[in-house]
Amino acid sequence: MKTLIDSISAEVMKAFTENGYDAKYGKVTLSNRPDLCEYQCNGAMAAAKEYKCAPFMISDKIAEGLKDNAMFESVESVKPGFINLKLSKDYLASVVTSMKEDEGRFGCDKTDDPKTIIVDYGGANVAKPLHVGHLRSAIIGESVKRIGKFMGHHVIGDVHLGDWGLQMGLIIVELKERKPELVYFDENYEGEYPKEAPFTISELEDIYPTASKKSKEDEAFREAAMEATSELQRGRRGYRALLEHILNVSVTDLKKNYDNLNVSFELWKGESDAQPYIPGMVQMMKDEGYAYMSEGALVVDVKEDTDTKEIPPCIILKSDGASLYSTTDLATIVMRMEDYSPDSIIYLADQRQSMHFIQVFRCARKTGLVDDHVKLIHIGFGTMNGKDGKPFKTRDGGVMRLEYLLDEINEEMLKKITENQKEKENLDISDEEAKKTARMVALAAIKYGDLSNQASKDYIFDIERFTSFEGNTGPYILYTIVRIKSILAKYQANGKDLPNGAILPAHSASEKNLMLVLSRFNAMMENAYEELAPHKICAYIYELANAFNGFYHENKILAQEDESIKDSYISLLMLTKGVLETCIDVLGFSAPDRM
């Protein structure tokens, strides 16, 4: 279905052409003065320069040419040359009726040119619990992936686990100190290794920080860890078997924690999966003359003539021959191109890593790891801060585990929902339902609180504000959906089936406003996809929720005596609910049936 703004522009462009002017001047925009009109065209101002006449002479002609067009209720030429447009109620009703008939899509067509897109997000490390620093990558990445899928693209989410490097050696050496009798440490052992891991997730989460602390204080321990890392990377059997156990135990726990965030991945590949691609890639870079030695390291120049700041060379191998993050990221690109031939790879990572991605992307292009048509995109996000404006910490200044943060918000939400029920004396909700509802609303509070901000901006994580049922919050959006569900349930409780007829022309300004906001859904979704911008969806559903609540407070819906008008209202509510639910699903949360 064509976007409404394109349909309006087509009519205005036609009027420009019919009056002898270039169609390009007929482009229409949303009105920046909604008190005066709904859409506007400022093209006469620019056209006046080309056609050497006063702008209002052009705008007058266009307005005259459109005055009998059934699309418009009014077309007004305003000096010095603006064209103000109001849509006819009949036309708008036909637009929202078409949306309602297109169930599940609501006028937003899937692309006819589907692309393969890999979204690299999550950033989890094995043997370490998720903490609040992982929140933004997971939340934004999941939404970007869902937006792409909704638009009809083949989108693959990859967690890209941190499962390589010194951290593995640290775990192995600490485990050896604690359990030296394990067969994994016997170099002469040739049998099969146990299928069950020799540690639990809680043990593993204690082993790593202990080992990390020791390595900073004990040089011999650190050297042993570096040697264990080298042996693992050279393929020592026992250490490889331990790596498998570490991965299995960690991934099981990570999946559980990501599930609590309603985040899932199609791929659970890690840095270790890219290692086999490194030798061939490095050799190619040497053979083709891209890589050269500089101060003992192997590097590739990535600076360009148009650079306004210094872009250092991309280091491929350190002086001791060890690989770096850049090496692994480049090898991962090689692996992804081989396995999936993606058209785009999108990375979700802190914006402070922007230089790293500039170097990696330029190196990948220069050395031919990707074709020219492949897009490499870094969505750099800002910091989640506490009320003091500094990075979010626990009360004692530590980094908060993600599960503890979720528990804290769940408790806050449960308290509010319980109080809400007491106030309404609606005590038929069981403890189990209240807890389930609290979890759903808490997730909406966290995700909406994050996604409603432009990704690149820092934001204040304010539990009190995020969990409020009023204002621009997740709970307010859910409360609006639940209100609509309640009205529809009452309508059906009277023994009536939900209507499937046309939506009638608006009977009030608030109803027309609701229709106008609904009619922008497909254009908004296209824009959110093009700009990889979940915050555009948040801004839209907040406007839609406000438009619905304005309509709800000004109109009797179930008490409407005219049955045809009542059925039209119910149809409009069904569409509003469908659009809101589609949007929150793309944002990564859902609404309960009651609150």
Give the positions of each predicted feature.
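NTP-dependent nucleotidyl-transfer catalytic core
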Residues: T17, Y21-A46, Y51-M595
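Generic start-of-chain signal for non-secretory N-termini
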Residues: M1-Y21
